[in-house]
Amino acid sequence: IRLTLGNFNMNGGGFKENTSKTDLYFTGTVRDEFILNKGDIITPLTEQSLGLLGTTARIPESGKYIQSQDVALVRCKEGLLDHNFCYYLISSSIVRQQLSAAAQQTKIRHTSPEKIKDCTVWVPDFEVQKNIGRILTDIDNKIAINRRINDNLPMLGRSLKGAEARLVA
């Protein structure tokens, strides 16, 4: 599946399946370097909706998604930048502000991997990065669990009403 800007969740960040397009499946030959793996970090290079630059997402499954020209794959230097810390760093307000200020064009704005690398940020030592990244990832995982629970509450309510009706009858 070809990644698009529709794979970025504008409300809170993260990955979402793109259901707005029908031409997402690519059947041609793809070089291995463009096939993404579970956990890879991606960020958009084009801003079709205000606030999209600096959004980050993680690839949910290996071998299913391919990188497109509007999406950058973020690679962290081993031992220098923690993968989880980087995910949150790119989506931080300080990086997003810099990307927005440096974006080209006025209507549909663009950035580049070089402009992302040029952002000025404070980065703690690697062990602190790992701790921060782990804590933020744990919080996001708990939020995802709570959302799934909330999504199931209406079904639980219907089940309870059905059970209540059977008890009364």
Residue ranges and their predicted role:
Residues S92-V121:
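Specificity-determining recognition surfaces
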Residues Q69-V71:
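Glycine- and aromatic-enriched periplasmic loops at the membrane-periplasm interface
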Residues D82-C86, K115-S159:
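Amphipathic alpha-helical segments
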Residues S49-R58:
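Short, Lys/Arg- and Gly-enriched loop/turn segments at beta-strand edges
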Residues K77-Q98:
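Glycine- and charge-enriched low-complexity intrinsically disordered segments
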Residues I1, G6-I41:
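Sequence-specific dsDNA recognition surfaces
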Residues I1, V74, A169:
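Conserved aromatic/hydrophobic "specificity hotspots" at molecular recognition or selectivity sites
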